[in-house]
Amino acid sequence: LWEDLSDELKQYPNSLVAYELLNEPVSNDPKNWNRVAALAISAIRAKEADRTIVVGVCTTNSNAMYNELTLPQTHQVLMTFHYYGPYLLTAYGLQSTTGGRTDIPIQYPGQLVPDQYIKELPEAWQSTGQRYYNRESLSQNLMKGITKAKQLNVPVFVGEFGTMKTTPEPSRANWYRDMVDILNENKVPYTSFDYKGAGYSIVGEGQQILYPELVNILTGR
């Protein structure tokens, strides 16, 4: 596949096109992803010695396996990962988190869900709801990926982060503000997910800005 894609895309300069091997690779054994990534990198390098290649971190049981990532070579390779933690907050209101409910109080920073409402969460999320999250806890998690990139001696790019529109607006803004501050502090480039159309969007279908505060946070205004 990547041999064919390289043949098609190599006409475009490196300044315009980079190749991400696979979006959000998932495997019960991260070694599988390391093997596949090495094969793909080798195939691309045989045709394009200097093309920028973006390699994602393998996810196992919803956990990013930063420490398991290996690279066969690091020339013009960039590491990427996505961050949606704590997922109970960022995916608030989904069937998979709150059972589709949006009437259970949730907040950030602080204990995510007040004690008196914990039992209203699906059992799998009750322990998460009892935990305390703030800028420090976000930073600790993000630094796992940032540190791994430093160990590999490659640049790092946070390709996605965001919260659902159903997340209460004050907490949503607080979370975005901390995320952007941490990434800027560590000089890590990033992309917010997403722009419009999906449940995470900040702009409506008619290009209207739905959440001006989030736009200001993301643009540094």
How would you describe each model-predicted region?
Residues 1-2, 34-37, 172-178:
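Charged helix-capping and loop-helix junction motifs
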Residues 167-221:
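Aromatic-rich peripheral "rim/lid" segments of glycoside hydrolase catalytic domains that contact
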Residues 3-132, 143-163, 185-188:
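Active-site region of glycoside hydrolase catalytic domains
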Residues 5, 138-145, 176-180:
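Short, acidic/polar
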Residues 87-91, 112, 121, 136-137, ...:
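Generic alpha-helical secondary structure signal
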Residues 31, 136-139, 170:
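Soluble non-cytosolic domains of exported or imported proteins
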Residues 129, 140, 147, 213-221:
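Aromatic- and carboxylate-lined catalytic core of secreted/periplasmic carbohydrate-active enzymes
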